[in-house]
Amino acid sequence: MKRAMGTSEAPRTLRTTLPARAYTDGAWFAIEMDRVLARMWLAAGRVDQLDHAGAFIRRDVAGASVLIVRAGDGSIRAHHNVCRHRGTRLSVEERGTFQGSIQCPYHAWTYGLDGRLLAAQLGDLPSRFAPWAMQDLRLAHRIEYDVATNWKLVVQNYNECLHCPVIHPLLNRMHHYLGAENVPPAETYCGGAMGFKDGVETLSTDGKRRREFLPGLRGRDREVVNYFAIYPNFLLTLHPDYMMTITIWPRDCGRTTLVAEWHFHPDEMKKKDFVCADAIDFWDRTNREDWAISEQSYLGISSRGYQPGPYSERERQLWEFDQFVLARVNQSP
């Protein structure tokens, strides 16, 4: 009987415990975190722990810190506990209640309970721009450009006027190309004001102003144009009598859509003799000059003969923008 039983059974596989390194080796642990816990649903808590809007619990696992939040619409959301700005943790508490929004303790970037970015710190820009009352201005004209260049070259071109005497004969008649009064560098924007040459009143095809000053402007604000690049994709140009903006939409590394919009005060737009073609034509011409040279820059950079060149002292804002991009490209996901 024993011999018969022995011949009818297959040899058993010896089952053993895991090797010691499965419990003690940091590299093994890291693989478990990445391939097991980070890729599967985890038991994080009970729904009744989040019994009101803004209630949250924090869970730290597999190299991530996650905020699980009851949103205003009653849904439950999970957000990385990381600010998009500089990576600061949004909350160090294990549980609590957000009062309507989630605000980073570092630079006050503010998010909705649903995770949407609601506000980003722009330093003193809101107070600086308050006299223009941009919220009161109304859109009069819009032009969309399809430009064969990298989006960063558009920002860099906007941030200096050393090219103005060569590329922009009309603009160069309005400003002195070395006349920029730049504000101190900031992390999320750069820019400043440029005064007019004698006899120039605004940026138009002939330098004449055909509209009243914007109501909130006084003194020096009536005598300059403010140029600000607000990172990453907004170019704001404020004149004594109107506002021109450019929104940058990268499509691929060598193609960018640029949307230019001209805004005026509604009281001016209601007038029977209201005109805006002088401002639109001025900037459409100037913009196209910029887009053409930006396309040529991209072609040159795409050549195998390209090597990075030095910035001059008057191109510091371009370097600052480069650092803004590099800091985010090089940060950990």
Residue ranges and their predicted role:
Residues 16-18, 22-61:
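Non-catalytic accessory segments flanking enzyme active sites
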Residues 2-20, 135:
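Short, contiguous pre-domain boundary segments
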Residues 32, 64-66, 332:
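Soluble FAD-dependent oxygen oxidases
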